């Protein structure tokens, strides 16, 4: 983005004056060596890496110790949506973006649309695709030839429950959603303060994963047009199911990740949690005293005997379009996410579920410390991970997700099953309107 | 918007004809109680942070809110150990942004306020009103354009990017103008000029000392404003070693779904970050006088 | 920044430039860091991005002129209109209560008959030192039934208290945070004005047997009216710009939408939807409305409480 000459001149004058005043500026974002290709091997390269995943300091330290020529600096960011805006603003401004960025899978189309990510297909080894499940690999290629990142972790969804409370009230672990509703009702009847779960209107990713399990895929590409299918039969099934449970009052309607929810995890009034593979870390942080009381089971299914799940969370490591060291950055990203050493650190220090299939066996040999009572935790999880259903994200996930917060917030507050369906329709409309307004071709 | 306001003369005293000469210094229990209730209301959340920061992560959600525990020191140590003492770096950054920013702001505001109060010149009213209009534009909106402009000169992700935009303060200029008008008598300036003192000398040796109490208020005001500003540093800074405390703590809270929010660290951090501010306030207690209107009488 | 000392002979002539020298740093900084970004935002408010095809890859997005489209969309957006109404209500709740309490506390501080004045003054002013984001986090803990001491007490005395974050009450929950953070500052402003009243003024009334309430009502309040008006004005502007409190409380409840206040809508458009263009248009509307309200209000009260300065 270019500014008018006058504005630039004024700004430059200001800057010159200030620099003359003799203050040192902060660390520069990117390396000063603009050279690409083979000549840079001899020179030292400094890379910056924006991330908020845990354990990154440890894995980067291991890399830096072994690679004096390519030094990586971790800059820990806020994990919220604004981190993406921050990157996009830097892209618009033409400077200020890091070399590497943690990119959640659902944000990749948005970032690619804003030309924020570098296509690293020329810098990666062609065999790398074999390290990942097809679905995971597709989320960094968007189905094309380009490669917009190296997958780091994924979040296949599972059902977590308090084994002690289930035993106490003689509840069976639900294998279908119909059973889940029964168990929720029984539990709430046995202890009116207890719930088997909550419908969280602040976690769009969670709801997306639930619809993914039911067979929804909210976006699609049709030639040169996008299609939006948020208000599909599959999503409607999920929305009205949860709306019904909330209306009956057997499921809570308060958001997750609040101090209130933490307290409920601690005192056992949230006796179950439909979550993802990274749940042990969250539970350990929020309710450390309940260690060993939780168990993990496959998601309840829509039809008995089915074997399907969705994804909640997970991200890749991408190289930004402003990086002057794409090759070095790609080298680091590849090592971090596909070498056994790095994957071991990611699991041990970060508690991530690595996307790298060959590295899983060794890295996941022991169950999470929070689940000493479930030695086969990762064996079960790896089986579940194979049943993640396909799903396509579009270029305005942020719009859809913010519409989810607002619309389902209203619905959850009203405690009416019908309001959940209305919310879904409103989400669909907001998403399509936004695409049309930006000039996208939308296949309706 | 105009602030060239002057109050009317105080109304004449209304004499009452009630005969009783009431004992004026009798203590009133009611007014004491009302004021103490107000004080309690204001202290309650602060007391809460104090108690909460003594709890371990588990206790925070399991024990009664106002039951103190013994983990304050552990919490401080954990927070200090976070990423190699990054928290203290954020504290130092905040002190730099708010301290240096407010100090520069005071100098700039004092000059401008003095100029506006003690001189009459073409465009005075227009300049003042334009500066005041700056109050109307919310900072959330300005952060992105400010970023795009600073990026043109390569100043983003530096201390400058937060410091420079923080220096200009319409409120500060407004207050400084009032203090200059109220506290610096015209005849003193005239006498100094007759003695041949230059403008720099008049400002530094005569005007500033007279304005000091007011300028301390401007300093406090701007210090808190910069301290409070979240959006500007958030968007300007990519390097977490340059973050101020607000941006840093908010990052600990927004860790994404797959991470537990670090409530204990955030609460301990909030407590530690408020302490210097409270100390500053107590230290400068006698300067707490925000005179928004009175000075304009003489302007 | 140093101001050149003019030679004696040129003293009178230099006087003409002196005010501009004093104003130069402020004006330069103002131009660079406020006027220029405002102008840039204004420019952006008339622009928009158009995408071609799937919008993926280089060159798929171009910035084009949008005319008044962004403005029209903002003004007809029901979410925006709702947010304006909500904030008007919020202001109606908050500002009178905040200034009323600030005045009351200031009067009590000014009365020799009150005990514990030093302690109370410090305590009530203290919240001003707490950043809004942190204040909202603290109150958030105090609002959530399971972790709040209030609900614990209510529970013990058997009172079924309503959820303060439910849709009927959430406005008050947010206003309370604004009140907590703002009452002390306004109290200090009014207290400063009260201290400036010469004590003879009311000692005489006191000797004549006027009660403290009569003195407050007939002497003190009229004198601090100009301060009250300005605190009202600044509180009104702050109300229109309310942002940090609802933003921080939002993840805790279903009842605060992403467009709860006008500024939250600006934030959502700019930071969540990456649409700086409509965010800019909405903020121009907010700034103009703030200006019109402030100006209108000053016009309204000026005749009553102020005499126009002629300079």
List the model feature ranges, each with a label.
Chain A
Residues 1-46, 65, 432-444:
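Short, low-complexity disordered leader/linker segments with a strong preference
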Residues 89, 97-99, 127-165, 306-310, ...:
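A structural signal for short loop-to-beta-strand junctions that line the ligand-binding cleft
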Residues 167, 384-444:
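Conserved C-terminal helix/tail region of periplasmic/extracytoplasmic solute-binding proteins
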Residues 65-132, 167-175, 264, 268-272, ...:
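Extracytoplasmic "Venus flytrap"/periplasmic binding protein-like
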Residues 146-152, 157, 178-228, 234, ...:
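Extracytoplasmic/periplasmic solute-binding protein
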Residues 278-290, 303-406, 442-444:
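C-terminal lobe and pocket-closing loops
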Residues 105-157, 210-212, 295-297, 444:
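Hinge/lid segment of periplasmic solute-binding proteins
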Residues 184-186, 225-255, 299:
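Glycine-centered hinge/linker elements that transmit conformational signals in sensory
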């Amino acid at each position: 983005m270019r500014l008018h000459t006058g504005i630039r001149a004024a700004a430059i004058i200001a800057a010159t004056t200030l620099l003359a005043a003799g203050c040192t500026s902060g660390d520069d974002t990117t390396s000063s060596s603009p050279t690409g290709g083979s000549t840079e091997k001899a020179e030292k390269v400094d890379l910056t890496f924006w991330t908020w995943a845990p354990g990154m300091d440890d894995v980067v330290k291991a890399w830096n110790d072994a690679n004096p020529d390519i030094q990586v600096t971790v800059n820990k960011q806020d994990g919220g949506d604004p981190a993406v805006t921050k990157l996009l603003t830097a892209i618009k401004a033409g400077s200020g973006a890091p070399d590497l960025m943690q990119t959640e899978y659902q944000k990749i189309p948005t970032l690619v649309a804003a030309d924020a990510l570098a296509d690293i297909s020329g810098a990666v080894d062609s065999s790398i695709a074999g390290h990942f499940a097809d679905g995971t690999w597709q989320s960094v290629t968007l189905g094309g030839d380009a490669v917009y990142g190296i997958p780091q972790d994924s979040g296949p969804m599972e059902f977590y429950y308090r084994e002690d409370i289930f035993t106490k009230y003689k509840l069976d672990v639900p294998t279908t959603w119909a059973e889940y509703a029964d168990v929720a009702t029984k539990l709430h009847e046995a202890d009116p303060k207890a719930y088997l779960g909550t419908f969280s209107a602040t976690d769009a990713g969670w709801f997306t994963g639930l619809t993914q399990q039911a067979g929804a895929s909210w976006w699609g590409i049709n030639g040169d047009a996008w299609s939006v299918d948020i208000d599909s039969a599959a999503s409607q099934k999920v929305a009205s199911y949860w709306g019904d449970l909330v209306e009956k009052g057997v499921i809570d309607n308060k958001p997750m990740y609040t101090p209130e929810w933490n307290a409920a995890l601690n005192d056992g009034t949230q006796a179950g949690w439909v979550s993802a593979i990274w749940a042990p870390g969250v539970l350990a942080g929020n309710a450390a005293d309940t260690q060993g009381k939780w168990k993990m089971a496959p998601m309840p299914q829509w039809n008995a005997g089915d074997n399907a799940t969705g994804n909640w969370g997970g991200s890749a490591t991408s190289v930004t379009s402003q990086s002057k060291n794409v090759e070095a950055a790609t080298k680091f990203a590849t090592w971090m996410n596909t070498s056994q050493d790095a994957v071991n650190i990611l699991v041990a220090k970060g508690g991530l579920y690595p996307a790298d299939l060959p590295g899983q066996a060794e890295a996941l040999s022991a169950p999470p410390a929070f689940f000493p009572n479930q030695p086969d935790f990762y064996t079960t999880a790896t089986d579940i991970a194979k049943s993640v259903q396909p799903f396509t994200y579009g270029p305005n996930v942020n719009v859809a997700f913010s519409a989810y917060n607002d619309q389902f917030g209203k619905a959850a507050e009203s405690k009416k099953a019908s309001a959940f369906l209305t919310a879904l329709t409103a989400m669909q409309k907001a998403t399509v309107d936004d695409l049309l307004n930006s000039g996208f071709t939308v296949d309706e | 918007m105009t602030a060239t306001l002057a109050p009317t003369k105080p109304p004449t005293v209304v004499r009452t004809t009630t005969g009783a000469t009431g004992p004026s210094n009798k203590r009133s229990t009611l007014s004491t109680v009302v004021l103490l209730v107000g004080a309690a209301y204001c202290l309650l959340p602060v007391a809460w942070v104090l108690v909460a920061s003594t709890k371990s992560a588990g206790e925070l959600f399991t024990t009664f809110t106002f039951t103190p525990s013994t983990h304050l020191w552990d919490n401080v140590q954990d927070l200090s150990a976070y990423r190699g003492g990054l928290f203290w770096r954020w504290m130092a950054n905040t002190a730099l942004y708010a301290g240096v920013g407010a100090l520069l702001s005071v100098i700039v505001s004092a000059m401008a306020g003095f100029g506006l109060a003690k001189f009459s010149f073409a465009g005075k009213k227009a300049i003042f009103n334009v500066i005041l209009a700056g109050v109307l534009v919310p900072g959330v909106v300005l952060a992105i354009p400010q970023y795009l402009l600073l990026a043109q000169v390569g100043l983003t992700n530096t201390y400058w990017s937060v410091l420079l935009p923080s220096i200009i303060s319409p409120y500060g200029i407004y207050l400084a103008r009032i203090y200059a008008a109220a506290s610096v008598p015209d005849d003193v300036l005239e006498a100094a000029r007759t003695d041949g003192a230059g403008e720099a000398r008049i400002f530094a040796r005569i005007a500033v000392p007279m304005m000091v109490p007011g300028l301390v208020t401007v300093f406090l005001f701007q210090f808190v404003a910069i301290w409070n500003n979240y959006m500007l540093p958030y968007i300007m800074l990519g390097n977490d070693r340059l973050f101020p405390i607000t941006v840093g703590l908010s990052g600990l809270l927004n860790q994404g779904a797959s991470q537990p929010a670090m409530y204990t660290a955030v609460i301990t951090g909030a407590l530690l970050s408020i302490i210097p501010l409270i100390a500053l306030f107590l230290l400068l207690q006698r300067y707490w006088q925000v005179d928004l209107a009175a000075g304009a009488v003489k302007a | 920044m140093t101001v050149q000392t003019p030679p004696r002979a040129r003293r009178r002539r230099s006087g003409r430039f002196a005010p501009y020298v004093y104003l130069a740093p402020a004006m330069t900084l103002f131009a660079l860091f406020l006027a220029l970004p405002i102008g840039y935002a204004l420019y952006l408010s008339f622009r928009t991005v158009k995408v071609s095809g799937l919008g993926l890859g280089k060159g798929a997005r171009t910035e084009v002129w949008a005319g008044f489209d962004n403005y029209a969309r903002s003004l007809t957006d029901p979410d925006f209109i709702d947010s304006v109404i909500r904030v008007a209500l919020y202001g109606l709740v908050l500002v009178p209560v905040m200034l009323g309490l600030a005045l009351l506390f200031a009067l009590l501080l000014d009365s020799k008959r009150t005990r514990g004045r030093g302690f109370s003054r410090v305590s009530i002013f203290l919240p001003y030192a707490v950043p809004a984001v942190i204040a909202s986090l603290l109150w958030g803990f105090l609002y959530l039934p399971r972790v709040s001491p209030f609900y614990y007490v209510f529970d013990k005395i058997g009172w079924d208290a309503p959820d303060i974050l439910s849709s009927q009450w959430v406005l008050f929950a947010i206003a309370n945070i604004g009140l907590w953070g703002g009452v002390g500052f306004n109290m200090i402003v009014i207290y400063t004005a009260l201290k400036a009243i010469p004590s003879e003024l009311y000692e005489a009334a006191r000797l004549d047997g006027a009660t403290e309430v009569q003195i407050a009502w007939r002497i003190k309040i009229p004198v601090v009216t100009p301060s009250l008006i300005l605190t009202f004005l600044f509180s009104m502007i702050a109300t229109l710009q309310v942002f940090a409190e609802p933003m921080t409380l939002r993840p805790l409840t279903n009842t605060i939408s992403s467009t709860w206040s006008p500024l939250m809508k600006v934030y959502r458009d700019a930071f969540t939807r990456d649409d700086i263009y409509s965010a800019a248009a909405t903020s121009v509307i907010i700034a103009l409305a703030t200006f019109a309200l402030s100006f209108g209000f000053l016009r309204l009260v000026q005749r009553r409480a102020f005499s126009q300065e002629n300079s």
